[in-house]
């Protein structure tokens, strides 16, 4: 599910957090909890969770860094919503129907650091570096995130991407679709609700 009505918002703005909170609330209510929400920023995760505190009728668990305790608590709860970042993109599995909705809040592009800067200097142009390094890194991490909820052909899960860059006219839509297995696509929340009801 990649919503058709995603607007580009200023990174770190209240508008960004409010738009995401609204999308997440609608998805969580459609799937009656059972949701893993993956963030690329702890700050954004905290801001969105604050906005949702009184809007979601299901228990919410937030993982800061790699808290095995919180993950174990989520796994024991019914209908819970887990907000996570960092290491939860890989290495933590939620098999079967434990997670019926996986929400990827932003495309997982690497944060620039001295290593990436050194790599960047090996390419003639920024565009070449983005296509050869940045995009493949994002695709790999996106597949890892996708794999948190869908491990086998028997697993079913709504996977939502709430980044406008993956939407219909978004800059990275083709790269996102190339990274993931072929799936039934949806752009409206009603289609998600129909899919959940049909399971």
PLM regions with names:
Residues 1-199:
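ASCE RecA-like P-loop NTPase motor cores
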